[in-house]
């Protein structure tokens, strides 16, 4: 089994990259993919860059060149669920775009033309993540993660997203694009991110302060998932 792991930023991948044994690096179109093993599991770790286009391009390169059996999208997110605080975990049931709008043609808010309204995470991978959350005794929410090419920092965009997607648990800038590409390739995926900020008018300051915390927590989760997969063989 080979596991694809995707993070957008250097801070989101560095702790995992440092663990990779027999590491080799593939550089293509601004993306970096690190291949090797973590705890005996074959991995391909992508640093995609920030935003939907970078995430989509990087995920495509990862799936084409490395052919992982599954994908885990890791990193940080802004928490919208009321129970989430910095360092907590959010696990995707599904991912949607919050900045796509072709409703004039009968599509749902966030739905791209010709695509499903949401990209649904793999049930077995959700269960794997939840078992690791229980094992690590972490606080977590499972639900909808919304993505867009904007850092949500202010009352107006926050209110718009909550009004359009009332059950949204977290927001960030890549997960829906990752899910979109995995859907097209037929590759199972799950998003497992740690909260770096609670999306509000001060979230930019919280993000800068707590990104390191989120990176450590999301890495902890990915490691636990890899360890469980290694035990299963």
Curated annotation (Swiss-Prot):
Its EC number is 3.2.2.9. GO terms for cellular component: cytosol. It is an enzyme of class 3 (hydrolase). It holds the Pfam family PNP_UDP_1. One of its GO terms (biological process) is L-methionine salvage from S-adenosylmethionine. InterPro entries: MTA_SAH_Nsdase, Nucleoside_phosphorylase_d, Nucleoside_phosphorylase_sf. The keyword Hydrolase applies. Pathway: Amino-acid biosynthesis; L-methionine biosynthesis via salvage pathway; S-methyl-5-thio-alpha-D-ribose 1-phosphate from S-methyl-5'-thioadenosine (hydrolase route): step 1/2. The active site is at residues 12, 197. One of its GO terms (molecular function) is adenosylhomocysteine nucleosidase activity. Keywords: Amino-acid biosynthesis, Hydrolase, Methionine biosynthesis. Substrate binds at residues 78, 152, 173-174. The keyword Signal does not apply. Catalyzes the irreversible cleavage of the glycosidic bond in both 5'-methylthioadenosine (MTA) and S-adenosylhomocysteine (SAH/AdoHcy) to adenine and the corresponding thioribose, 5'-methylthioribose and S-ribosylhomocysteine, respectively. Also cleaves 5'-deoxyadenosine, a toxic by-product of radical S-adenosylmethionine (SAM) enzymes, into 5-deoxyribose and adenine. Thus, is required for in vivo function of the radical SAM enzymes biotin synthase and lipoic acid synthase, that are inhibited by 5'-deoxyadenosine accumulation. Homodimer. Belongs to the PNP/UDP phosphorylase family. MtnN subfamily. This is 5'-methylthioadenosine/S-adenosylhomocysteine nucleosidase.
């Amino acid at each position: 089994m080979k596991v694809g792991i995707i993070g957008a930023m250097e801070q989101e991948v560095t702790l995992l990259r440092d663990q990779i044994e027999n590491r080799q690096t593939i550089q293509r179109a601004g993306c970096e993919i690190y291949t090797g093993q973590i705890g005996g599991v074959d991995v391909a770790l992508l640093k995609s860059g920030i935003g939907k286009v970078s995430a989509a391009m990087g995920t495509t390169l990862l799936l084409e060149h490395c052919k992982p059996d599954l994908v885990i999208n890791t990193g940080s997110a802004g928490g919208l669920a009321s129970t989430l605080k910095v360092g907590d975990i959010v696990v995707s049931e599904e991912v949607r775009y919050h900045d796509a709008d072709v409703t004039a043609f009968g599509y749902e808010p966030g739905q791209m033309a010709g695509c499903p309204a949401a990209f649904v995470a793999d049930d077995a991978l959700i269960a794997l993540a939840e078992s690791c959350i229980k094992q690590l005794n972490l606080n977590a929410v499972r639900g909808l993660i919304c993505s867009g090419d904007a850092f949500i920092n202010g009352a107006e965009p926050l209110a718009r997203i909550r009004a359009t997607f009332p059950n949204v648990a977290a927001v960030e800038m890549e997960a829906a694009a990752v899910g979109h590409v995995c859907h097209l390739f037929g590759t199972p995926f799950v998003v497992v991110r740690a909260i770096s900020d609670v999306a509000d008018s001060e979230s930019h300051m919280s993000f800068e302060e707590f990104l390191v915390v989120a990176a450590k927590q999301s890495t902890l989760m990915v490691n636990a998932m890899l360890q469980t997969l290694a035990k299963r063989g």
